[in-house]
Amino acid sequence: MENKVIQDRLALLRKKMQEEGIDFYMMLTADFHNSEYVNDYFKVREYFCNFTGSNGTLVVWKDGAGLWTDGRYFIQAEAELEGTTVELFRMLQEGVPTIEEFLEQNMQQGQTLGFDGRVIAAMDGKKYEKVLEKKQIRIAYEKDLAESIWTDRPDFPAGKVTVLDEKIAGKSVEEKLTETREKMAKDGANALLLTKLDDLMWLFNIRGCDVECNPVAMSYAYITEESATLFIQQKALDAQVTEYLAAHRIEVKEYDTVVDFLKALPAGNAILVDNRYCSYTLYKTLQKNQKLVEGKNPTELLKAIKNPVELARMQEIFLKDSVAVTKFIYWLKTHVGKEKITEVTAADYLEQKRREIPEFLDLSFPTIAGYKSNAAMMHYEATPDNCATLEPEGMLLVDSGGQYLGGTTDVTRTIVLGPISEEIKKHYTMVAAAVMQLTHAHWLYGCTGRNLDILARQPIWDMDIDYQCGTGHGVGYILNVHEGPQNMRWRFTGGMVEAVFEDGMDITNEPGIYIQGSHGIRIENVMVAKNDVKNEYGQFMHFETLTWVPIDREAIDEKYLNDTQKKYLHEYQKTVYEKISPYLNEEEKEWLAKETRVK
């Protein structure tokens, strides 16, 4: 079926491209800081192709259009692109060109590539420069072509900013600035242009609300050896925040003056920029008069290693969150088939359980609740107008989390609602085995997630199946649910950043199996890397679990598990009962005892 709305928007865009002398135009769902999740104001790619996933790049040319996205979104993209005339390019699949390869192969000598340089990372802009220079292709990065077409575009975000008390943050702004400057100096820089929103919030101990579920405020910072300048919308600051920033000797300037400020800097500074998050526009501005030190934001690693205050609060919050999820599972299992429950109303009930926790602030991302085959779409999002009704059969996958004054949670459970096939039971059992194997990793300091990923992936690979995405990501502290530089993947991909696991780093553990048209299974816990024995061989490490939610007993068939996997699973279930049961009523407690095989 044709999607006339999208086709008409693309026609208007092509007309605008012709007027501006642009042959190929590129759009991402990205903001001026290359954030993963963005305010609705920045959803230009979605506006022009209907794809709502968090990762994807749309390229439009005279007689065609293509969307590049990763394995998490293949199924979703197929459905959302139907009838739009936009072709799906499945990234990292055999025979599929990268965006750079496609542009190199399809753009002609002397043509023009256009994009809004404020939403393209400098890293990507530089790649396009290099690929296209041999054909003398011009890059036009000064214009947002959507501006005149998207007439009902949402307002630019400017939500209220708040201060995060040092008792909750665990470190003062002064301590964080000192650590940042030390790392900056080691990189040979005398200044830092910081553009990554969660790094900015962490550094200044502030939080915002400019991105749904991400407590960040639109901002930049310019840090020197002596000063710190914060560029932020001053209408978002109340008197308390203004006084707080002044008390910590942080100069405040208006958000949209950053380009003029950088242009006016004396020439010759050695400025550290992280090209993954610095926009192409800011990069080109600095390139004219400054020496650019291209490296990683020093704040990223500092933020990723949680301090003792953060870790203590996280343990408390994850326990409360685990209780809420466990209560939700009990409610769902005892009410399905007795009253109408949809994917959306189930998610709403879980949100309500979280809202009962005093420290609750917001969700950490929109809840993913996928029933039966919908669960095969890793980032499926049901809507009131388009959602499945749950029946006492099959399974419901629920991936959810909360923002609390004390931590950010992320947990997935796949819940049995009634009869399931032997194949599904086998798949579920092996996903549970995968989670347990990674949970019990024991390694020498120096490993990255790529070294450990096989522990989770092996039970699934043994069935000749793969889940086509990473196994884990870092989680912020009252910040973004996806955080780096630590991650867990099985292979290296272009532009990928890796980090050695440090004591205090958190990571998700979320293997899965996704069978299109049938079912999806994911189990996800959050863990913290901790130092273990240190001896003549080096520093050994292990993971400590933060998430304590039962793994569904009805979906486990122990004939597929070896003795070690059984032992790990029984230990986890036993600990779940010990930690969660004190917060349950008698009916819930009795159910949990059976669910975890304690009685």
Regions found by a protein language model. Give the residues of each.
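Active-site neighborhoods and metal-handling regions in enzymes and metal-associated proteins
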Residues: 1-599
